[in-house]
Design a protein with these regions (language model features):
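General small-molecule cofactor/ligand-binding pocket signal
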Residues: 31, 51-53, 155, 244-248
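Conserved Rossmann-fold cofactor-binding substructure of NAD(P)-dependent oxidoreductases
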Residues: 43-70
Length: 307
Protein backbone atom coordinates (compact mmCIF):
# COMPACT_ATOMS: atom_id res chain seq x y z
CA UNK A 1 0.00 0.00 0.00
CA UNK A 2 1.43 3.39 -0.98
CA UNK A 3 2.27 6.04 1.61
CA UNK A 4 -0.39 8.70 2.19
CA UNK A 5 1.11 12.17 1.81
CA UNK A 6 -1.08 15.09 2.87
CA UNK A 7 -0.59 18.74 1.97
CA UNK A 8 -2.12 20.59 4.93
CA UNK A 9 -2.96 24.25 4.47
CA UNK A 10 -2.78 26.48 7.52
CA UNK A 11 -0.66 23.86 9.26
CA UNK A 12 0.74 26.38 11.74
CA UNK A 13 -2.78 27.56 12.59
CA UNK A 14 -5.57 26.12 14.70
CA UNK A 15 -7.50 23.72 12.44
CA UNK A 16 -4.58 22.98 10.13
CA UNK A 17 -2.27 22.36 13.07
CA UNK A 18 -4.75 19.97 14.65
CA UNK A 19 -5.11 18.14 11.33
CA UNK A 20 -1.35 17.92 10.83
CA UNK A 21 -0.81 16.51 14.33
CA UNK A 22 -3.55 13.89 13.91
CA UNK A 23 -2.14 12.82 10.54
CA UNK A 24 1.42 12.58 11.83
CA UNK A 25 0.20 10.40 14.73
CA UNK A 26 -1.45 8.15 12.13
CA UNK A 27 1.79 7.75 10.19
CA UNK A 28 0.78 10.06 7.34
CA UNK A 29 3.52 12.18 5.80
CA UNK A 30 2.64 15.89 6.07
CA UNK A 31 3.66 18.72 3.74
CA UNK A 32 3.09 22.29 4.95
CA UNK A 33 3.48 25.65 3.22
CA UNK A 34 4.81 28.32 5.61
CA UNK A 35 5.65 31.99 5.13
CA UNK A 36 8.45 31.86 7.69
CA UNK A 37 10.12 28.47 8.28
CA UNK A 38 12.07 30.00 11.19
CA UNK A 39 8.94 30.90 13.19
CA UNK A 40 8.30 29.03 16.43
CA UNK A 41 5.07 27.48 15.13
CA UNK A 42 6.84 26.26 11.97
CA UNK A 43 9.78 24.82 13.91
CA UNK A 44 7.42 23.08 16.35
CA UNK A 45 5.58 21.52 13.40
CA UNK A 46 8.83 20.42 11.79
CA UNK A 47 9.94 18.76 15.02
CA UNK A 48 6.78 16.66 14.92
CA UNK A 49 7.86 15.38 11.51
CA UNK A 50 6.21 17.70 8.99
CA UNK A 51 8.06 18.65 5.81
CA UNK A 52 8.05 22.46 5.44
CA UNK A 53 7.99 24.41 2.19
CA UNK A 54 8.51 28.20 2.15
CA UNK A 55 5.89 30.21 0.28
CA UNK A 56 2.27 31.31 0.32
CA UNK A 57 -1.05 30.78 -1.45
CA UNK A 58 -0.36 33.57 -3.96
CA UNK A 59 2.74 31.79 -5.25
CA UNK A 60 1.93 28.96 -7.73
CA UNK A 61 5.51 27.65 -7.77
CA UNK A 62 5.62 27.23 -3.99
CA UNK A 63 2.21 25.54 -4.07
CA UNK A 64 3.47 23.16 -6.74
CA UNK A 65 6.52 22.30 -4.63
CA UNK A 66 4.47 21.68 -1.48
CA UNK A 67 2.00 19.58 -3.47
CA UNK A 68 4.77 17.37 -4.88
CA UNK A 69 3.94 13.71 -4.26
CA UNK A 70 0.84 14.55 -2.22
CA UNK A 71 -2.11 12.17 -2.31
CA UNK A 72 -4.42 14.28 -0.13
CA UNK A 73 -5.12 17.94 0.66
CA UNK A 74 -6.65 19.61 3.70
CA UNK A 75 -8.07 22.96 2.60
CA UNK A 76 -8.68 25.66 5.19
CA UNK A 77 -8.57 29.28 4.01
CA UNK A 78 -8.96 32.31 6.23
CA UNK A 79 -11.27 35.13 5.12
CA UNK A 80 -9.73 38.58 4.67
CA UNK A 81 -12.16 41.40 5.46
CA UNK A 82 -9.91 44.00 3.82
CA UNK A 83 -9.85 42.00 0.56
CA UNK A 84 -13.06 40.02 0.31
CA UNK A 85 -12.04 38.21 -2.90
CA UNK A 86 -8.78 36.88 -1.48
CA UNK A 87 -10.24 33.77 0.18
CA UNK A 88 -11.70 32.47 -3.10
CA UNK A 89 -8.53 33.37 -5.02
CA UNK A 90 -6.41 31.41 -2.55
CA UNK A 91 -8.78 28.44 -2.68
CA UNK A 92 -8.72 28.45 -6.48
CA UNK A 93 -4.91 28.55 -6.52
CA UNK A 94 -4.75 25.56 -4.18
CA UNK A 95 -7.43 23.56 -5.98
CA UNK A 96 -5.79 24.28 -9.35
CA UNK A 97 -2.46 23.02 -7.96
CA UNK A 98 -4.25 19.98 -6.52
CA UNK A 99 -5.72 19.07 -9.91
CA UNK A 100 -2.45 19.78 -11.74
CA UNK A 101 -0.48 17.51 -9.38
CA UNK A 102 -1.99 14.39 -10.92
CA UNK A 103 -1.36 12.53 -7.64
CA UNK A 104 -3.98 13.91 -5.25
CA UNK A 105 -7.04 11.69 -4.88
CA UNK A 106 -8.54 13.18 -1.69
CA UNK A 107 -9.50 16.71 -0.70
CA UNK A 108 -11.05 17.75 2.61
CA UNK A 109 -12.36 21.29 2.95
CA UNK A 110 -13.12 22.97 6.27
CA UNK A 111 -15.91 25.45 5.60
CA UNK A 112 -18.40 26.69 8.23
CA UNK A 113 -21.79 25.61 9.53
CA UNK A 114 -24.64 27.13 7.46
CA UNK A 115 -22.46 27.64 4.38
CA UNK A 116 -24.56 27.29 1.23
CA UNK A 117 -27.76 28.16 3.09
CA UNK A 118 -27.24 31.92 3.07
CA UNK A 119 -30.24 32.60 0.85
CA UNK A 120 -32.42 31.26 3.69
CA UNK A 121 -31.19 33.96 6.08
CA UNK A 122 -33.79 36.61 7.03
CA UNK A 123 -33.50 39.70 4.79
CA UNK A 124 -30.78 38.11 2.65
CA UNK A 125 -29.57 40.32 -0.19
CA UNK A 126 -26.49 42.06 -1.64
CA UNK A 127 -26.29 44.40 1.37
CA UNK A 128 -26.60 41.65 3.96
CA UNK A 129 -23.87 42.02 6.63
CA UNK A 130 -20.96 39.73 5.81
CA UNK A 131 -22.62 38.59 2.56
CA UNK A 132 -19.16 38.21 1.01
CA UNK A 133 -18.16 35.79 3.78
CA UNK A 134 -21.07 33.41 3.15
CA UNK A 135 -20.85 33.66 -0.63
CA UNK A 136 -17.13 32.86 -0.54
CA UNK A 137 -17.65 29.74 1.57
CA UNK A 138 -20.43 28.51 -0.72
CA UNK A 139 -18.33 29.19 -3.82
CA UNK A 140 -15.36 27.25 -2.46
CA UNK A 141 -17.61 24.33 -1.52
CA UNK A 142 -18.85 24.25 -5.13
CA UNK A 143 -15.25 24.33 -6.37
CA UNK A 144 -14.40 21.32 -4.19
CA UNK A 145 -17.42 19.34 -5.40
CA UNK A 146 -16.62 20.14 -9.02
CA UNK A 147 -12.86 19.60 -8.78
CA UNK A 148 -12.94 16.10 -10.19
CA UNK A 149 -10.85 14.84 -7.26
CA UNK A 150 -11.86 11.21 -6.59
CA UNK A 151 -12.68 11.61 -2.88
CA UNK A 152 -13.96 14.82 -1.33
CA UNK A 153 -15.34 15.75 2.07
CA UNK A 154 -16.70 19.05 3.36
CA UNK A 155 -16.53 19.78 7.08
CA UNK A 156 -18.59 22.64 8.49
CA UNK A 157 -17.46 23.54 12.01
CA UNK A 158 -19.56 25.81 14.22
CA UNK A 159 -18.14 28.48 16.57
CA UNK A 160 -14.70 27.36 17.73
CA UNK A 161 -13.94 27.24 21.43
CA UNK A 162 -10.49 28.77 21.02
CA UNK A 163 -12.27 32.10 20.52
CA UNK A 164 -12.62 32.17 24.32
CA UNK A 165 -8.83 32.02 24.75
CA UNK A 166 -6.08 34.48 23.90
CA UNK A 167 -5.23 35.89 21.45
CA UNK A 168 -8.70 35.50 19.86
CA UNK A 169 -10.62 36.51 22.98
CA UNK A 170 -9.08 39.98 22.97
CA UNK A 171 -10.98 40.69 19.75
CA UNK A 172 -14.03 38.45 20.02
CA UNK A 173 -14.76 39.21 23.69
CA UNK A 174 -12.66 42.27 24.65
CA UNK A 175 -14.64 42.98 27.82
CA UNK A 176 -14.02 39.43 28.99
CA UNK A 177 -10.31 40.19 29.06
CA UNK A 178 -10.91 43.49 30.86
CA UNK A 179 -13.01 44.38 32.90
CA UNK A 180 -13.95 40.68 33.11
CA UNK A 181 -17.43 41.10 31.67
CA UNK A 182 -19.27 39.07 29.04
CA UNK A 183 -20.83 42.01 27.16
CA UNK A 184 -22.62 40.89 24.04
CA UNK A 185 -25.19 41.64 21.37
CA UNK A 186 -26.50 38.11 21.92
CA UNK A 187 -29.95 37.75 23.42
CA UNK A 188 -30.14 35.94 26.78
CA UNK A 189 -31.92 33.02 25.09
CA UNK A 190 -29.51 32.74 22.15
CA UNK A 191 -27.69 29.41 22.13
CA UNK A 192 -24.25 29.30 20.54
CA UNK A 193 -23.27 25.98 18.95
CA UNK A 194 -19.61 25.39 19.69
CA UNK A 195 -16.79 23.01 18.77
CA UNK A 196 -13.22 22.29 19.79
CA UNK A 197 -11.05 23.05 16.73
CA UNK A 198 -8.97 19.97 17.52
CA UNK A 199 -12.03 17.90 16.66
CA UNK A 200 -11.95 19.35 13.14
CA UNK A 201 -8.49 17.83 12.92
CA UNK A 202 -9.83 14.44 14.01
CA UNK A 203 -12.51 14.45 11.32
CA UNK A 204 -10.16 15.77 8.64
CA UNK A 205 -7.52 13.16 9.43
CA UNK A 206 -10.13 10.39 9.39
CA UNK A 207 -11.37 11.53 5.97
CA UNK A 208 -7.81 11.52 4.64
CA UNK A 209 -6.85 8.15 6.13
CA UNK A 210 -10.16 6.49 5.14
CA UNK A 211 -11.36 8.58 2.18
CA UNK A 212 -13.94 6.11 0.89
CA UNK A 213 -15.73 6.12 4.26
CA UNK A 214 -16.16 9.90 4.12
CA UNK A 215 -16.49 10.42 0.38
CA UNK A 216 -19.05 13.09 -0.57
CA UNK A 217 -19.97 13.63 3.07
CA UNK A 218 -20.88 17.18 4.07
CA UNK A 219 -20.64 17.22 7.85
CA UNK A 220 -21.90 19.98 10.13
CA UNK A 221 -19.74 19.92 13.26
CA UNK A 222 -20.74 21.04 16.75
CA UNK A 223 -20.89 19.41 20.17
CA UNK A 224 -23.45 21.44 22.15
CA UNK A 225 -25.38 24.72 22.16
CA UNK A 226 -24.91 27.01 25.16
CA UNK A 227 -26.56 30.28 26.19
CA UNK A 228 -24.45 33.26 27.32
CA UNK A 229 -25.28 32.43 30.95
CA UNK A 230 -24.10 28.83 30.50
CA UNK A 231 -20.87 29.98 28.87
CA UNK A 232 -20.17 32.44 31.70
CA UNK A 233 -20.97 29.79 34.30
CA UNK A 234 -18.38 27.40 32.84
CA UNK A 235 -15.72 30.11 32.49
CA UNK A 236 -16.31 31.16 36.10
CA UNK A 237 -16.25 27.59 37.37
CA UNK A 238 -12.96 26.72 35.73
CA UNK A 239 -11.22 30.02 36.51
CA UNK A 240 -12.66 30.65 39.95
CA UNK A 241 -13.31 34.25 38.83
CA UNK A 242 -16.53 36.25 38.91
CA UNK A 243 -17.65 37.33 35.43
CA UNK A 244 -20.34 39.92 34.83
CA UNK A 245 -22.96 38.95 32.23
CA UNK A 246 -24.19 42.00 30.30
CA UNK A 247 -26.13 42.68 27.10
CA UNK A 248 -26.26 45.67 24.78
CA UNK A 249 -29.73 47.14 24.39
CA UNK A 250 -31.45 47.19 20.99
CA UNK A 251 -30.42 50.76 20.16
CA UNK A 252 -26.78 50.06 21.02
CA UNK A 253 -26.83 46.91 18.88
CA UNK A 254 -28.27 48.79 15.89
CA UNK A 255 -25.59 51.48 16.11
CA UNK A 256 -22.66 49.12 16.69
CA UNK A 257 -23.73 46.73 13.93
CA UNK A 258 -23.30 49.49 11.34
CA UNK A 259 -19.51 49.19 11.53
CA UNK A 260 -18.53 46.32 13.84
CA UNK A 261 -18.15 42.89 12.18
CA UNK A 262 -18.10 41.22 15.58
CA UNK A 263 -21.49 42.67 16.50
CA UNK A 264 -22.86 41.79 13.05
CA UNK A 265 -21.90 38.17 13.61
CA UNK A 266 -23.59 38.15 17.03
CA UNK A 267 -26.79 39.56 15.53
CA UNK A 268 -26.61 36.79 12.92
CA UNK A 269 -26.33 34.25 15.72
CA UNK A 270 -29.51 35.64 17.29
CA UNK A 271 -31.40 35.44 13.99
CA UNK A 272 -29.93 32.29 12.42
CA UNK A 273 -27.09 30.68 14.34
CA UNK A 274 -25.00 27.58 13.70
CA UNK A 275 -27.53 24.78 13.27
CA UNK A 276 -26.06 21.32 13.82
CA UNK A 277 -27.84 17.96 14.06
CA UNK A 278 -25.97 16.43 16.99
CA UNK A 279 -27.74 13.08 16.53
CA UNK A 280 -26.43 12.83 12.96
CA UNK A 281 -22.85 13.07 14.24
CA UNK A 282 -23.27 9.96 16.38
CA UNK A 283 -22.79 7.75 13.30
CA UNK A 284 -19.12 8.77 13.15
CA UNK A 285 -16.62 7.00 15.45
CA UNK A 286 -15.15 10.28 16.69
CA UNK A 287 -15.73 11.59 20.20
CA UNK A 288 -16.25 15.34 20.41
CA UNK A 289 -14.96 17.53 23.25
CA UNK A 290 -17.53 19.31 25.38
CA UNK A 291 -16.99 22.91 26.54
CA UNK A 292 -16.41 22.06 30.21
CA UNK A 293 -13.80 19.48 29.25
CA UNK A 294 -12.11 21.91 26.85
CA UNK A 295 -11.84 24.62 29.50
CA UNK A 296 -10.44 22.16 32.04
CA UNK A 297 -7.80 21.11 29.53
CA UNK A 298 -6.91 24.75 28.85
CA UNK A 299 -7.30 26.02 32.42
CA UNK A 300 -4.01 27.96 32.40
CA UNK A 301 -5.02 29.76 29.21
CA UNK A 302 -8.45 30.57 30.67
CA UNK A 303 -6.73 32.12 33.69
CA UNK A 304 -4.64 34.31 31.38
CA UNK A 305 -7.81 35.66 29.76
CA UNK A 306 -9.31 36.50 33.14
CA UNK A 307 -6.12 37.62 34.88
Amino acid sequence: MSQTVAFVTGATGHQGGATARELLKSGVKVHALVRDPSSKSAIDLQRLGAHLFPGDFDNPSSLKAAMGGATAVFLNILPVSSDTNREVIHAKNIIDATIASGTVTTIVYSSVTMAGRHEEFPNWGPDYPLAWYWESKAQIESMVRGSGIKYWTILRPAFLMFNYLLPKASYMFPDLVRPRAFLMAYKPTTAMTILDGSDVGKFAAAAIVEPSAYNMHEIDLGVESLTPAEIVRELSRVSGKDISLQFYNEKEVEELALTDLRIQSQVWTNEVGYQVNFKELEKYPIRLTRFAEYLEKHREEVLKVLA
